Amino acid sequence: MSKIVGSDRVKRGMAEMQKGGVIMDVVNAEQAKIAEEAGAVAVMALERVPSDIRAAGGVARSANPKIVEEVMNAVSIPVMAKARIGHITEARVLEAMGVDYIDESEVLTPADEEYHLRKDQFTVPFVCGCRNLGEAARRIGEGAAMLRTKGEPGTGNIVEAVRHMRKVNSEVSRLVVMNDDEIMTYAKELGAPYEVLKQIKDHGRLPVVNFAAGGVATPQDAALMMELGADGVFVGSGIFKSEDPEKFAKAIVQATTHYQDYELIGKLASELGTAMKGLDINQISLEERMQERGW
């Protein structure tokens, strides 16, 4: 009997339901409950937040299934979990556990340096990172139902997420005015599937939601990414590495929803403690940048 896989329409529809919301990284049931109470639309269960993964070095793998299960039992909102790029078995284990989404993530150490997962062969929907339209189209071609900027995880520095969001949007704007012959050439230039680029042209935008991720540390950061066209926001280290996680979580949710209410955002920010300590992207070598993982 052939394996039943979810259709693109169903998977993308599930991701569309998270639009306009905040998805928070959590490492235990207690943090998951804080995220849910703050208004998160989903949580990402993992063993360590990106800043701790960066600090520890070594090989970062998918979370212990026990942690994922504890988070799933603690909240009623969707639960995501990360698998290494190309690690079929990590992803299959998470699918068997019943997680709502899998993030094929560059935050973890890649398991395969040539191939990403064939996400269209899974029932569970996948989210993947991208820095440009080529990466976005390749991931969609493999079956990703949701995208996010890669940014530079664990830095508390929004600059790379801004760069990636602007890059994708500008390349989509360039694509939508092309004719079919030009799209064929552009597909070759980007190393992207022609059919996916044609789909993007016909939609006038990416056919899946594209969230901001990688460096969101303050309510202002979250609002900025929404202003730039993000469909929602992932927050990794920014909440639970802050002085007051509960307040930061609620403030980031509010700022994401009301991203053009600058008076409210200012009020929210003024009532918070210290944000997580940030890293200057220029002090991180190319070899140490998580965004460079994947192809």
From Swiss-Prot:
Keywords annotated in UniProt: Lyase, Pyridoxal phosphate, Schiff base
Molecular function terms from GO: pyridoxal 5'-phosphate synthase (glutamine hydrolysing) activity
Catalytic center residues: K82
Catalytic reaction equation(s): aldehydo-D-ribose 5-phosphate + D-glyceraldehyde 3-phosphate + L-glutamine = pyridoxal 5'-phosphate + L-glutamate + phosphate + 3 H2O + H(+)
A Pfam family: SOR_SNZ
Listed GO biological process terms: amino acid metabolic process; pyridoxal phosphate biosynthetic process; pyridoxine biosynthetic process
PROSITE patterns linked: PDXS_SNZ_1, PDXS_SNZ_2
Binding site for D-ribose 5-phosphate: D25, G154, G215, G236, S237
EC number: 4.3.3.6
Pathway listed: Cofactor biosynthesis; pyridoxal 5'-phosphate biosynthesis
Sequence positions that bind D-glyceraldehyde 3-phosphate: R166
Similarity remark: Belongs to the PdxS/SNZ family.
Listed PANTHER family: PYRIDOXAL 5'-PHOSPHATE SYNTHASE SUBUNIT SNZ1-RELATED
Function comment: Catalyzes the formation of pyridoxal 5'-phosphate from ribose 5-phosphate (RBP), glyceraldehyde 3-phosphate (G3P) and ammonia. The ammonia is provided by the PdxT subunit. Can also use ribulose 5-phosphate and dihydroxyacetone phosphate as substrates, resulting from enzyme-catalyzed isomerization of RBP and G3P, respectively.
Quaternary structure note: In the presence of PdxT, forms a dodecamer of heterodimers.
Protein name per the record: Pyridoxal 5'-phosphate synthase subunit PdxS
Organism: Staphylococcus haemolyticus (strain JCSC1435)
Gene: pdxS
